[in-house]
Amino acid sequence: MSTGTVVQVIGAVVDVEFPHDAVPQVYDALEIKSEGLVLEVQQQLGGGVVRTIAMGSSDGLRRGLEVVNSGSPITVPVGSATLGRIMNVLGEPVDEAGPIGEEDRYVIHREAPSYEDQSNTTELLETGIKVIDLVCPFAKGGKVGLFGGAGVGKTVNMMELINNIAKAHSGLSVFAGVGERTREGNDFYYEMEDSGVLDKVAMVYGQMNEPPGNRLRVALTGLTMAEKFRDEGKDVLFFVDNIYRYTLAGTEVSALLGRMPSAVGYQPTLAEEMGVLQERITSTKTGSITSVQAVYVPADDLTDPSPATTFAHLDATVVLSRNIASLGIYPAVDPLDSTSRQLDPQVVGQEHYDVANGVQTVLQRYKELKDIIAILGMDELSDEDKTTVFRARKIEKYLSQPFFVAEVFTGSPGKYVSLKDTIRGFKGILEGEFDHLPEQAFYMVGSIDEAVEKANKK
């Protein structure tokens, strides 16, 4: 193990000089023992100098400090010892519950599985959330993105998915908190503890207040832990909140390293960095990784390079809309914007496909009629269009659902709706079975039977 000295410190960027015959490789982990700080090599500048990014605060660093080369990239603990624990980007425990006691350590920079090793089976994963199961069904071993601007419910939706899937699925989960609020990480821990699934979840956090190096690598740390479970033949759920912060950390690091920015100030390597992470999130013939990723959409603009680059890697996209949230309909999923590769008659079956298509057709027609209604009023519509509008409004209301994780602030008990009940309910509305019921009866209920019961009470 060679040693070098710090020659320059500019924020999170630290330049280290090594003997010419012992220059570290790119991605090698270096350690400043006196400060307990790990650095990751990003560039070799020549003359024995390497440019690194600090995986922690660089406050108090000075020139001349001794740096030791570990000879390998950052390694993190993997395996069952990580379950129920909160770790940082280096796999160190931050939950004050003692050492991890790991059985094994993996490097965080690994190759994606080869195409031959990947699995291509399609099995649906029921979430219990009506709008998602109907219009953008998830596949086991697939990748799902939750897209939305600030404050439309990405984290709440993700928490509900974790609550529903992790409980019903009884598999293992890894949660990577990338550049999000510390409070959310704390809430998540207690949520898992209350649900009794804490011993099945490994948590890795790199919060908003941490240096860009941590936020850039914490997703890889979580993914490495998930890969270990997958390679042991288990089905793993991998949650990332928020993938946009991963991109943002890459932008910060890129600027610190002096690279020329590209469109909207993002790093020129945006597509490649996203690809490196996403290509590793895949299912093999041994086990599966089902990934759910929250994606912040800057200024609600889905064409922004960051969300646009993420779109390409996903099997299903759940788009959360501010307009729907403003109507008080939660989850604020836009059924016309959300998509899934699984919504195919050969995968979900003809009935499910026809009902989902019917719902989207009715909602699209209602959207077109809104302008006419605003100018001329409902009376100018044909009887057929009036029926479409009434059914569309019922569908809109019925797409709302009380969440288990939101019970505290809504006061309504959460509801899990099976796929069979979801299809039956929407099919009934489309066929006019419930035309006699008031639309308010469909708001914030679980199955269609509850809507009927609610209407009869009134």
From Swiss-Prot:
Pfam families on file? ATP-synt_ab (PF00006), ATP-synt_ab_N (PF02874), ATP-synt_VA_C (PF22919)
Q: What is its EC number?
A: 7.1.2.2
- UniProt function note: Produces ATP from ADP in the presence of a proton gradient across the membrane. The catalytic sites are hosted primarily by the beta subunits.
* Major subcellular location class: membrane
Q: Which domain of life is it from?
A: Bacteria
SUPFAM superfamilies for the chain: C-terminal domain of alpha and beta subunits of F1 ATP synthase, N-terminal domain of alpha and beta subunits of F1 ATP synthase, P-loop containing nucleoside triphosphate hydrolases
User: What is one GO cellular-component annotation here?
Assistant: plasma membrane
Q: Name one GO molecular function term.
A: proton-transporting ATP synthase activity, rotational mechanism
Which UniProt keywords are listed?
ATP synthesis, ATP-binding, Cell inner membrane, Cell membrane, CF(1), Hydrogen ion transport, Ion transport, Membrane, Nucleotide-binding, Translocase, Transport
Q: What is this protein called?
A: ATP synthase subunit beta
Q: How would you classify this enzyme at the top EC level?
A: translocase
Indicate the quaternary assembly.
F-type ATPases have 2 components, CF(1) - the catalytic core - and CF(0) - the membrane proton channel. CF(1) has five subunits: alpha(3), beta(3), gamma(1), delta(1), epsilon(1). CF(0) has three main subunits: a(1), b(2) and c(9-12). The alpha and beta chains form an alternating ring which encloses part of the gamma chain. CF(1) is attached to CF(0) by a central stalk formed by the gamma and epsilon chains, while a peripheral stalk is formed by the delta and b chains.
* Recorded name of the encoding gene: atpD
Q: Which residues cross the membrane?
A: none
PROSITE patterns given for it? ATPASE_ALPHA_BETA (PS00152)
State the membrane topology.
Peripheral membrane protein
